[in-house]
A protein has these predicted regions:
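Rossmann-like adenosine-cofactor binding region
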Residues: 7-101
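Short alpha-helical segments used as structural interaction elements across diverse proteins
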Residues: 1, 62, 119-121
Length: 147
């Protein structure tokens, strides 16, 4: 079963997964993927209190914003085995500093904020750029924001 927690539920979201409360999501999930903006309400959402509510052996993946995770709390959970593994494409301070505690965790994969950079994504960016330049040279505007 695919579950999701979102403060802003939508009909489209209901087509993809079942909405549940955060505590239920934390308690039942084998994998927790963070795909959310950084708001005051989401900052530090992965912290020692919420980690304690998770299943033993959970895997946490953060592709969103570094400050969603309290890095020391995640490190402690990785070291204790509460969290079996983590993968983060973002950290609280970028570029990552040499003293970031997650660099010491053997069961944590860290990538340099490149999860968006799949070949298809990069190709789409190049195609849009070429189309925008062609339109400009032809005297047309595309995606004009100051109109």
């Amino acid at each position: 079963m695919l579950s999701r927690y979102d403060a802003f539920q939508s009909e489209a979201g209901k087509q993809v997964a079942t909405y549940v409360e955060l505590d239920e999501l934390l308690a039942k999930s084998d994998f927790i993927f963070l795909h959310c903006p950084l708001f005051p309400s989401t900052e530090g959402i992965i912290n020692k209190d919420n980690i304690a509510k998770m299943k033993d052996g959970v895997v946490i993946i953060n592709n969103s914003r570094g400050p969603l995770v309290v890095e020391q709390d995640l490190y402690d959970a990785l070291e204790s085995g509460k969290v079996s593994a983590a993968a983060v494409d973002v950290v609280s301070t970028e570029p990552i500093k040499a003293d970031n505690v997650l660099l010491k965790a053997k069961n944590c994969i860290i990538t340099p904020h490149i999860s968006w950079a799949a070949q298809a994504s990069r190709q789409r960016i190049m195609d849009i750029t070429v189309d925008n330049i062609k339109a400009f040279l032809d005297g047309n505007t595309v995606n004009r924001v100051n109109k």
